[in-house]
């Protein structure tokens, strides 16, 4: 595995808006997976060594993104940073890593807060459009344990009870409001666990059923349920048979299925 570290994607925030690349050794045509870390929009960072399995075991390149968080940031700064990072990374790969097929094999995903951010980029087109992209410029999205309603720390910013279920412009599910053309829906892989945060499995099911209600092409959408795991437990859990992280196995299977079509 090769690395390119500490690349600034927003010069106005050089201490925070950084991305690390984890690349396969072989410079052959490969997918690129942009990963947004978790931490409740107030913690966490781009240093996610469990993602090493993707380039080392599956030949999938990874760009691990750090973004502004509370208390310095406010809604929707972190969504805007995420969109800026995707556009920057796509252009950076075109110019510096031309063997990565970002035209046909570009994936975006995240876990927990990062799953919320990936959902916002997937369903709320205005964020990527600001940077000259649209959600379908991304081949597929991996939403791992994200909150499809207003994120609990955005509720806290508003002075509200963080347990409230609210749906407005800060909720990914808000934007599921029409029946799309199948070609306008990117592939999706949605992950959640049995012992997730209270109400997270139910909200995940609501997201899935709302897409079905609006006649999304459900054959393009996968759901993965992890019995026995807590919130994002599949990130650090490894398969005892081969020692590969469960999240990476799931992500790689999804990416390989989509790119083989």
What are these regions (language model features)?
Residues 45, 63-104, 239-243:
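Catalytic nucleophile-loop/oxyanion-hole region of alpha/beta-hydrolase
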Residues 29-39:
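Short beta-strand element of the alpha/beta-hydrolase
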Residues 205-208, 213-261:
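C-terminal catalytic histidine-bearing segment of alpha/beta-hydrolase fold enzymes
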